[in-house]
Amino acid sequence: MKKYFVLAFTLLFCNISQAAVYMIDFKCDQEAYKVFATMTLDELDDQFLEGSKKLARYHDLTTGSGIVLVEADEPALVIEFANGWSEVCESLIVPVVDDKEAMEILTR
C-alpha cells in the first residue's frame, strides 16, 4: 500500500516534464542470470531506451534479486525495459526521490 501511495504522490506533486527516477525491485530465476552473464556491460546498458538511463544496478546473487535505478522522461520507458525481462524476472517499479526532493515534497 505504501508503494502505491508513493506512486500517486509522485505523479500528483512532481513536475511531470522533468525526468524522474524509478527503482525496479527484481527477482530473477537462474535462466536470467545465465543470459545476463553472456552479455557485455555495453549490451546491458544499450537495453535502456532513448529517454531513459541506468543510474545503478545492484544484485543479491544469493537470492537472485536486486534493484535497478533508472532515470526516465516517461514511466512507459521503464516499464518497457522491465517487460524485456518479464519471462525470467518478476519486477516492481516504484518512483523514488532523493533527500532534497523528499524535503521539498514533505514541506509543501
Task: Enumerate the language-model features and the residues they cover.
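Short S/T/G/P-rich N-terminal loop/turn motif that feeds into the first structured element of a domain
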Residues: 4-65, 73-75, 98-108
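Conserved short beta-strand edge segments in small beta-sheet-based binding/regulatory domains
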Residues: 88-100
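Short amphipathic alpha-helices within nucleic acid-binding modules
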Residues: 73-83
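N-terminal cationic-hydrophobic initiation segments that often serve targeting/anchoring roles
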Residues: 49, 82-86
